[in-house]
Amino acid sequence: MLKKGQKFPNFKLENQNGEWITNETIKGSKTIIYFYPRDNTPTCTTEACDFRDNLEQFNGLNVQIYGVSGDTKKKHQNFIAKYNLNFDLLVDEDFQLSKAIGVYQLKKSFGKESMGIVRTTFIIDEDGVIIDVIEKVKVKTQIEELNQILG
């Protein structure tokens, strides 16, 4: 998994509207890119709604937010509409970026093993360098932790 101080890798992912988001898109402001397993699941919904409810505060710090999962554009569109999300969700259907940064891993859930995205949040500076990484995110305390990191 990528660590603090490393450069976030080059990427090109579509958002829910089919617009391409790349390293150039995020350059010039701090960025939170959070990786989550799946739209419309309880914990993922709580996490997305927490970002929605705190977006104005992050924007005030010149921080942009993107969520990334393996869901399709259509699923992202539905998720955004259902919960009135106010930030972009990026499509990583083939898990290319998730694999490159090390968040696509073997997971255990209810005694079953499967490959998938492990909930992880990257905080990236204006030049694309990772300021910090929150691994094994605890959704209940993530916003508070991000506030401490971003000062």
Where are the model-predicted features located?
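Chalcogenol-based redox active-site neighborhoods
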Residues: 1-151
